[in-house]
């Protein structure tokens, strides 16, 4: 966990070092993009350990506004039994607003709504899965992005992911890379 936090802090520190070589084209060009994201999921108030989150997104930028669809996978082990896991898949529709200050770093905020499907395993054996494991999901997002080239953007963000059954939520720290067409 300490290594992940160190990696995130170093990643945030590197972009300003290279800001002098930043692209001179406008940051907020309109058009479609695709990307990958990954990070750590920190469960809120539960008996679960932190675990990985990975996923992909496809979206469209219109000036300061972005709309995207994202598919993510989460895996958290139980504190009492590391062989028992809670696994989740989410499919989210996200909307973002990018604050363009004509600077290399662009802060953004966003919200998302979608679907979460959760299931439990123990030693790889499926314990429960079915239609009762589907819930409405929602998230709030805040982060910062950096344009590496005219088409590539790196980002770091925090997300609060919740779902309607009221039995839990996740705090997510993620890094992303997007390629704009």
From Swiss-Prot:
One of its GO terms (cellular component) is cell outer membrane. Pfam families: OMP_b-brl. Its main location: membrane. It is found in: Cell outer membrane. Residues 1-19 form the signal peptide. It comes from the Bacteria. Keywords: Cell outer membrane, Membrane, Signal, Transmembrane, Transmembrane beta strand. InterPro entries: OM_autotransptr_brl_dom, OMP/PagP_b-brl, OMP_b-brl. Belongs to the opacity porin family. This is Uncharacterized protein CBU_1600. It comes from Coxiella burnetii (strain RSA 493 / Nine Mile phase I).
């Amino acid at each position: 966990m300490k290594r992940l936090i160190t990696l995130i802090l170093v990643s945030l520190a590197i972009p300003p070092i290279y800001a002098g070589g930043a692209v001179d084209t406008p940051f907020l060009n309109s058009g479609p993009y695709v990307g990958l994201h990954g990070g750590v999921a920190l469960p809120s108030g539960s008996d679960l350990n932190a675990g990985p989150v990975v996923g992909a997104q496809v979206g469209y930028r219109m000036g300061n506004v972005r709309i995207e669809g994202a598919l993510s996978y989460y895996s958290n082990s139980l504190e009492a039994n590391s062989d028992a896991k809670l696994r989740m898949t989410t499919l989210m529709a996200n909307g973002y607003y990018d604050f363009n200050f004509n600077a290399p770093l662009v802060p953004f905020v966003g919200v998302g709504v979608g679907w979460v499907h959760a299931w439990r395993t123990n030693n790889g054996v499926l314990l429960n899965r079915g239609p009762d494991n589907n819930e409405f999901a929602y998230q709030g997002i805040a982060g910062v992005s950096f344009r590496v080239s005219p088409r590539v953007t790196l980002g770091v963000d925090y997300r609060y992911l919740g779902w309607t059954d009221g039995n839990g939520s996740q705090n997510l720290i993620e890094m992303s890379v997007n390629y704009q067409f």
